[in-house]
Amino acid sequence: MHSKKAKKGHKESDNEKISDLKRLAQETSDFAEIIELSDHENADVRLQAVKRLCPCRVQRDIDSVWQRLFEMTEDEDTRVRYQVLHNICDGSPDHLESQVVEAMEKFNRDEDKDIRRRAHKVLASYLRTGKWNVL
């Protein structure tokens, strides 16, 4: 039988690991590592990784980054999906137009009203002006 102190120590250890992974996501410049962290079971780690995958921070067109972002449109965590939506509409290259539109249509049916609202605004802008990089 585990004591309460042992359980607390285990929880603190887990929290420290999560904090270390979030810090790694913030500090590493290795996009393969960031992509790997974006697949972590902990939503806070995934969120931190996705923030690092924003085009304004990546500053390059990296296929594996875009592929991972499009995969994450169905993430279970609302905060992660919202950040993915932001990333897709903050500098995605022209050659990804069909994937961007498909992602926005998916987000337009999301269970979260804020994500739906933002996707609706992006789609309206796209239909009106042809531009989706509006965030």
Question: Can you annotate each of these PLM segments?
Answer:
Residues 1-12:
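Short Lys/Arg-rich cationic patches that frequently serve as NLS/NoLS or arginine-rich RNA/DNA-binding motifs
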Residues 11-15, 43-44, 74-79, 109, ...:
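Alpha-helix N-cap/helix-start positions at coil->helix boundaries
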Residues 54, 89-90, 124:
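Structural signature of alpha-helical solenoid repeat scaffolds
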Residues 82-107, 114:
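Extended alpha-helical scaffolding segments
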Residues 108, 112-135:
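Eukaryotic acidic, Ser/Thr-rich intrinsically disordered low-complexity regions
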